[in-house]
């Protein structure tokens, strides 16, 4: 299964184009949006693709901040409910003929990388080793920017996708 992780800007640059139409016709999309953060005056992040695709069956939109700790009441953390939504979306769409997943968050480096990592492990089982058995340096060599991956997102999704056979501790 092909998994592609991109920044939000990738979709913004293609909004309303034939390429956007092709992507939504051939891939399943997981869109991670940053919710508002009133204390900093941050508005709700807009979904970066055309209106016609926002409620498509091959699109899932989730909203949570790119943080691993609840440091004030306005922070929306990834939680088990969101992990369930992602898992159920993948279960529902994996046989729809699209054959690939595209995941985005604001920068395409932390939340979406964690989702892409788990999907890759679940679909492709690369490298013949479970991810919880990889040393940090091995992991970084295999997956690139590991130090930017949101470990809360990774842990919740690994636990949801791999169940009780694999309980992942934070990186």
Per-region residue spans from a language model:
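Short beta-alpha junction loops
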Residues: 35, 66, 106-109, 137-144
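PTP/DSP superfamily signal
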Residues: 91-100, 119-171
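Helix-loop module immediately N-terminal to the HCX5R catalytic loop
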Residues: 58-102
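A phosphate-binding catalytic loop at a beta-strand-loop-alpha-helix junction
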Residues: 101-118
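Glycine-rich, flexible N-terminal cofactor/catalytic loop recognition
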Residues: 1-62
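Short catalytic/ligand-binding loop motif for oxyanion handling, primarily in non-cytosolic enzymes
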Residues: 38-39, 69-70, 109-114
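Lipid deacylating catalytic domains
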Residues: 50-60, 81-82, 163, 167-170
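A structural signal for well-ordered alpha-helical segments within the folded catalytic domains
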Residues: 80, 84, 113-117, 121
